[in-house]
Amino acid sequence: MKADIHPTYAETTVLCGCGNTFQTRSTKDGGRIVVEVCSQCHPFYTGKQKILDSGGRVARFEKRYGKRKAGAEKAESADK
């Protein structure tokens, strides 16, 4: 391997939006990574279903297209 071409692989602290912190290793400078969700608060791991709205995107989508049921559109097109 060539010398001085690989980034340093150092201990890094990951800080989640829920307040959970854990240690890992990364090549990112600064020693700190901030994330919105982690395994402690992600709905897949916790079993809780909630909408994670990043910047109002879900609200903007619902405003534009309205709240629709998944099977309602298919049933209407089948009746025609």
Swiss-Prot record:
PROSITE patterns cross-referenced by the UniProt entry: RIBOSOMAL_L31
Cofactor binding notes: Binds 1 zinc ion per subunit.
A single Gene Ontology CC term: ribosome
A molecular function (GO) term: structural constituent of ribosome
Functional note: Binds the 23S rRNA.
Record-stated family: Belongs to the bacterial ribosomal protein bL31 family. Type A subfamily.
Protein's name according to its UniProt entry: Large ribosomal subunit protein bL31
Annotated organism of origin: Mycolicibacterium paratuberculosis (strain ATCC BAA-968 / K-10)
